[in-house]
Amino acid sequence: MALSMKMRANARVSGRRVAAVAPRVVPFSSASSSVLRSGFALRCLWTSAAWAALASVVEAVKKSVGDLHKADLEGKRVFVRADLNVPLDKATLAITDDTRIRAAVPTLKYLLDNGAKVLLTSHLGRPKGGPEDKYRLTPVVARLSELLGKPVTKVDDCIGPEVEKAVGAMKNGELLLLENCRFYKEEEKNEPEFAKKLAANADLYVNDAFGTAHRAHASTEGVTKFLKPSVAGFLLQKELDYLDGAVSNPKRPFVAIVGGSKVSSKITVIEALMEKCDKIIIGGGMIFTFYKARALKVGSSLVEDDKIELAKKLEEMAKAKGVQLLLPTDVVVADKFDANANTQTVPITAIPDGWMGLDIGPDSVKTFNDALADAKTVVWNGPMGVFEFPQVRQRTVSIANTLAGLTPKGCITIIGGGDSVAAVEQAGVAEKMSHISTGGGASLELLEGKVLPGVAALDEK
């Protein structure tokens, strides 16, 4: 990509992008259009992929909480947006997985150890425009207190006089947990007045909720207009470093593993990864759309008929770019979509009529393991099969074990996506991965090169 840059004197590079779309493509000789960002002018022959890659790199250079020191934090009221959306037992409301709480601890401890008064909020579940007891953050209090080694006080609101009174009574180094911010419909609508109320009792802002960074909500984007500085927490910064680093400057060979049920939900990320990857491994239900595009019989397997031409295009694109696109060579099929269905393993050329594919087979695992053997960077998003069925989740777990073996050999292994994370947890190898992303949708959008509103709104270094 040809690129020329010029900057005004005393101007600094901004991490924000003017628009979420690429400039129009023009011949370089007449490329007079430029994208201005605080005096930073870009002039080039653009492609959508080049634009996405540049946007992703620029966006990631944000001020972090680690750039703030005791003098900046002591006595200050810090509004922290974390992702405490933990799974709860439906009957007891007990936390069944505290991963997201543990992930928030480094940022919170840093702030508390430096004398800040921490106001912490999050969303939990999907409340329907008002308070619901099953979505209160109350279950978080005991576990968070245990992890921090100090008492955690909670109020039953996130704005208003109750919060103001509680904040007024806080001492340095104390934490106040505010209630679920999605109890107000204004949160997801990013209404300025609500954002102003969230910010009313704070002096500065820290966003450590990568899982919602792709949403422009009041607590992730709106509050930054009222609180300065607005910086990234350690978790958010780690996510950006790993995920953006994997795409913008990967150690090679770079392999992406993309699973899931539908081509339509992963098309953008597959296209973006083709610009960077040496190999792409495809798994999950989407493989049957590729098979049908090859004129193979797929039985009753899930197929997106309107995406068959797209599957052909992706295979052609991979060939043109010299990217090795690997599909399973055998599959586990069932006579019905049920956890207790009859199953058998067959080559992809021999799927019986009336049977549907639910997982990849053992030969496929061997093929994929061979492709991964020399990898130096691996990004994995999405399961290899129907992970919720215990009898057909073993291949996904096998891939998790393979990646765990690569990490000690110097390979950077990055896991993003709910079922991929569940697989490494179930295999007991989570600690052996380089990075496990806390945001499924956010990690996908970052890999696609999209601007994350919650990140773009933060202060640049």
Swiss-Prot record:
Example GO molecular function: ATP binding
Reported cofactor(s): Mg(2+)
Record's keyword annotation contains Chloroplast: yes
UniProt: AMP binding residues: K262, K266, G285, G357, E388
CDD domains hit by this protein: Phosphoglycerate_kinase
Gene Ontology terms describing biological process: glycolytic process; reductive pentose-phosphate cycle
Location relative to the cell: Plastid, Chloroplast
Record keywords, A-Z: ATP-binding, Calvin cycle, Chloroplast, Kinase, Magnesium, Metal-binding, Nucleotide-binding, Plastid, Transferase, Transit peptide
Gene3D superfamilies xref list: Phosphoglycerate kinase, N-terminal domain
Listed InterPro entries: Phosphoglycerate_kinase, Phosphoglycerate_kinase_CS, Phosphoglycerate_kinase_N, Phosphoglycerate_kinase_sf
Residues holding (2R)-3-phosphoglycerate: A82, D83, N85, R100, S122, H123, G125, R126, R182, H214, R215
Annotated positions binding ADP: G260, G284, F387
Transit peptide, residue positions per record: 1-60
Enzyme Commission identifier(s): 2.7.2.3
Superkingdom of the source species: Eukaryota
SUPFAM superfamilies, per database record: Phosphoglycerate kinase
One GO cellular component term: chloroplast
UniProt similarity note: Belongs to the phosphoglycerate kinase family.
Protein name, entry field: Phosphoglycerate kinase, chloroplastic
Organism: Chlamydomonas reinhardtii (Chlamydomonas smithii)
